[in-house]
Amino acid sequence: MPSVSVWVRSLAPMTTWTRAAIGALGEDLAVKHLDSLGMRVLERNWRCRYGELDVIAEDPAARAVVFVEVKTRTTDHFGGVVQAVTPQKVRRLRRLAGLWLAGRDERWAAVRIDVIGVRIGRQATPEITHLTGVA
């Protein structure tokens, strides 16, 4: 598989993309980032009536299940990844994580919520910011 920067450069110009397509690209890049850290993705886009979890991964080094919120931006007009994680968002993620865990038999030593910000701009390489353990 080509590097992330080569892969992104081979895509159509960003001006023709929908918000959903940009979000999906951000999630794909976040998953590649998690893979590079040795994490194993358990599920993507898990939904229930209360909302959606973008990525659920396992961190074998920490024996933890990690719920990852992915925020993709093409500009800085709406703030960075830190501004995107409001107390309400954290409460929602905790609730959704609890619901996902309730439906599983497997147990982990730790549960963590991470946020990955993906900034896709004119640069050849997307900027990835990974905030670990926000809740």
UniProtKB/Swiss-Prot annotation:
MF term (GO), any: nucleic acid binding
PANTHER family: UPF0102 PROTEIN YRAN
Family according to the record: Belongs to the UPF0102 family.
Lineage: Bacteria, Bacillati, Actinomycetota, Actinomycetes, Mycobacteriales
SUPFAM superfamilies: Restriction endonuclease-like (SSF52980)
Origin superkingdom: Bacteria
Disulphide bond pairs: none
The name this protein goes by in its record: UPF0102 protein Mjls_1965
